[in-house]
């Protein structure tokens, strides 16, 4: 591509350990980033912004600590720190073009940060600032990138996903309270089963979200252990022994999250099990959301030829050829997001295995998939809460009609007349399209008043064993 540009003024010459290289005149990056741009024209997708911002935090913390340790002149460190914080604030996202499919250590992205920050800092000081010797002082891509993944993933989960889940849970609980007295037909194997209330059905969804929140919070505890200071392979070569611990303290202050210096930095570089675990929690959440979304789709199906228990908010025309058709578009989007997150987890699982000896070499892929999953889940959870749960309506006439004809209500008579006799009643009620109460009156010795009590759907939602002349026990 660059050979097509005839105007040499559009380039400048940059130098790295491999020699000279032409770089676009206005680019903040240098030779190593340019080499990566030319080496990896693969997907057209650059590293996630959250990851780039985490690199900014790390470089700011490193400059501050290196100055405190007397390893970096304070005026230089001040400018590096300021430039790095600008990167962390997202002011230079466009200057991080390196493809996600790059060197497995993420060195190209680390050097992208080093070069951009060095350029910005030099503009302020007018003094030479080297991306390796100064910005990357006391660091290696091998400890910086795993640290950046953990920071960015933690920020994404705590800042977006967990609040979204809390919001969804609150909306589900609010609707459950409002619909608590409405009884509906339960279903197992997609077939009619015993009754339950909408509050009980919604409560199961809420419990799934509660469990997802708990699992995520538990996993985050392990993500808070940062391997910064391990440098190349975990030994801490070419860094001050106090650098890692001190830098992590600064990172905690910058992000507002209590991070810790990993006790075993070899693990933090060579193994990414905690990141695979986080991906697994995303996977489990995706499964839960897919279940909830599919329940909503089934309950909304129809409105005439399906279950038709609820009516979801009409958000857009559903068909380009069938007038008046409205589809459950948000639940469908939830299903697609869940499918993608499950796919991401497969990629992260394979990537987690791809570390030989002292370094995992699929770190950019892990970073991309984790942060993409967190973003997708956080966004779609909010939509599910605000565009579906809040506005759904129960079609009580339809729910009551189906409930009254549900032959499975006869299950409550098992302790009194036996399973086989109850089955006869259920089959006859279904075959003759009659309420089970009518058929039970004809097929049993129980009087209608007693049968009405025993087959009361509301009472059946409370469980227990029902006997003649008494309630559930």
From Swiss-Prot:
Record key words, sorted: Cytoplasm, Lyase, Tricarboxylic acid cycle
Reaction it catalyzes: (S)-malate = fumarate + H2O
Protein's cellular compartments: Cytoplasm
Biological process annotations from GO: fumarate metabolic process; tricarboxylic acid cycle
InterPro entries with a match to the protein in the record: Fum_hydII, Fumarase/histidase_N, Fumarase_C_C, Fumarate_lyase_CS, Fumarate_lyase_fam, Fumarate_lyase_N, L-Aspartase-like
Keyword Lyase: yes
A Pfam family that the UniProt record links to this protein: Lyase_1
Pathway as given in its UniProt record: Carbohydrate metabolism; tricarboxylic acid cycle; (S)-malate from fumarate: step 1/1
Enzyme Commission designation: 4.2.1.2
CDD domains the UniProt entry points to: Fumarase_classII
Main localization, broad class: cytoplasm
Site note Important for catalytic activity, residues: 332
Family in the record: Belongs to the class-II fumarase/aspartase family. Fumarase subfamily.
Quaternary organization: Homotetramer.
Miscellaneous section: There are 2 substrate-binding sites: the catalytic A site, and the non-catalytic B site that may play a role in the transfer of substrate or product between the active site and the solvent. Alternatively, the B site may bind allosteric effectors.
Function as written in the Swiss-Prot or TrEMBL entry: Involved in the TCA cycle. Catalyzes the stereospecific interconversion of fumarate to L-malate.
Protein's recorded name: Fumarate hydratase class II
Protein species of origin: Xylella fastidiosa (strain 9a5c)
Gene that encodes it: fumC
